[in-house]
């Protein structure tokens, strides 16, 4: 197998599209710099606060900047959000009451959203548990069925939930902003008061527009994904209409307290500001990494989504690896080529919020940061790996090259007892990683 030829071909795929994504990064950086300049960001805003933090000007100023960037009435950017899932839950639970109805417009959401909703898995404190009605509209041919969504609207409908990213699904595409706008327009034509809520995780700054530019009333995401630029150590954000954001803030803190409290500890404020400034550039490093991965693994005969030449609307690259051991081997290769915990061997485990065991490769500086190069997937057929992130494209290249050499072509792989797939490669790091797996599962092989 001439891997160097495959890698060179993949680089050509990246270069063919680079100008488009560089232009997007340029325009989004201009938007952020303009907001920083308008709000006269200074070193003073990056100081830590303690206790109630009533007068945290840096926190409040960052809210204003996010509202400007996303063109919304208000924003809530806080380190007190423990994850993107938390921000999504706060946004929904803050704006819904018993008897209200939510329509899931993008089919089955990813696993952690299912626990927030309480369907199909019953969870204490979920929407369904609190008496909120949930209706789910399947997507058709990977696209939103706007007609079915609109037909499902009743007088009780309070919110339409839109998941931008594909999540752990190979049956749908990530939505572009224009498609989200079309759905929102259709919903608001029927009922302008319905809250169109977008889960924007993984999608920020991949396009020139955001869902709030095309009518979204409420939107949420994670700071250890795109908008944190690889520097934010924790946190999440909610942006949208003032009343919706206020309701969410009351859910995060307490009724009446809303966004007026919440200390910014340590160096977090600077990391939030600097991370946001870096975000458009870092997001495009991740996009280029995803294009490269798609090109390499499609050349090796694996199904990839999106395709190498497909326009990107988030930073996720899905690769169908066809077996559980291929999935494990891929994650091992990514982990071995990480800057942190490179000596660790990933293995499947039960993780809160997920219905199947999950395997993750995440040798990241910030735990769980998916804007840093990481890969994960549920241990279920067809064994898709979802790779995302990459603070630098160069790091992404190195890790993907190693994963390709470790797994080999889809049609010419050699199978071992236990269905571990290994190529006859002589790279010492790859051999050492494979030996760990073989030893762990008591396998036998003559091909190491």
Q: What does each model-identified segment do?
A:
Residues 298-430:
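Conserved C-terminal alpha-helix-loop-beta "cap" of PLP-dependent enzymes
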Residues 46-76:
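Active-site-flanking structural segment that lines cofactor/substrate pockets
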Residues 67-91:
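Short loop-beta-helix segment that forms the pyridoxal 5′-phosphate
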Residues 49-50, 76-79, 315-320:
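Short glycine-rich or small-residue beta-strand-to-loop segments that form or flank ligand, phosphate
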Residues 2-16, 22, 32-38, 42-45, ...:
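Conserved PLP-enzyme active-site core in the AAT-like
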Residues 73-76, 100-103, 158-159, 193-196, ...:
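Structural motif
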């Amino acid at each position: 197998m001439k891997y160097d030829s495959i890698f060179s071909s993949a680089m050509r795929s990246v270069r063919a599209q680079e100008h488009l994504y560089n232009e997007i990064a340029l325009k989004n950086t201009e938007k952020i710099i303009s907001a920083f300049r308008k709000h006269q960001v200074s070193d003073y805003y990056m100081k830590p606060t303690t206790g109630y933090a009533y007068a945290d000007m840096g926190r409040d100023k960052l809210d204003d900047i996010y509202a400007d960037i996303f063109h919304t009435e208000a924003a809530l950017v806080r380190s007190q959000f423990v994850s993107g899932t938390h921000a999504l839950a706060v946004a929904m639970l803050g704006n819904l009451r018993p008897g209200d109805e939510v329509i899931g417009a993008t089919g089955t959401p990813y696993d952690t959203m299912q626990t927030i909703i309480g369907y199909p898995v019953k969870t204490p404190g979920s929407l369904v548990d609190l008496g909120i009605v949930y209706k789910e509209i399947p997507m058709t041919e990977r696209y939103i069925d706007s007609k079915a969504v609109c037909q499902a609207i009743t007088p009780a409908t309070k919110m339409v939930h839109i998941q931008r990213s594909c999540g752990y699904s190979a049956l749908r595409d990530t939505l572009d902003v224009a498609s989200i706008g079309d759905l929102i327009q259709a919903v608001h034509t029927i009922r302008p008061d319905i809250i169109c809520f977008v889960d924007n995780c993984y999608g920020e700054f991949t396009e020139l527009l955001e869902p709030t530019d095309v009518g979204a009333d409420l939107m949420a995401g994670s700071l250890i994904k795109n908008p944190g630029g690889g520097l934010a150590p924790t946190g999440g954000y909610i942006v949208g209409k003032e009343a919706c954001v206020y309701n969410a803030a009351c859910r995060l803190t307490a009724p009446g307290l809303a966004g007026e409290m919440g200390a910014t500890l340590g160096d977090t404020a600077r990391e939030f500001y600097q991370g946001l400034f870096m975000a458009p550039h870092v997001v495009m490093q991740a996009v280029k990494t995803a294009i490269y991965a798609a090109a390499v693994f499609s050349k090796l005969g694996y199904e990839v989504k999106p395709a190498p030449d497909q326009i990107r609307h988030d930073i996720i690259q899905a690769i169908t690896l066809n077996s559980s051991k291929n999935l494990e081997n891929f994650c091992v290769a990514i982990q071995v080529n990480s800057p942190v915990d490179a000596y660790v061997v990933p293995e499947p485990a039960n993780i809160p919020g997920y219905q199947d065991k999950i395997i993750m490769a995440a040798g990241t500086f910030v735990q769980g940061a998916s804007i840093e190069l990481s890969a994960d997937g549920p241990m279920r057929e067809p064994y898709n790996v979802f790779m995302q992130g990459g603070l630098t494209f160069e790091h992404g290249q190195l890790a993907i090259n190693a994963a390709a050499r470790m797994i080999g072509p889809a049609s010419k792989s050699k199978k071992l007892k236990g269905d571990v797939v290994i190529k006859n490669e002589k790279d010492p790091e790859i051999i050492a990683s494979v030996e760990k797996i073989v030893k762990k599962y008591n396998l036998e092989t003559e091909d190491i």
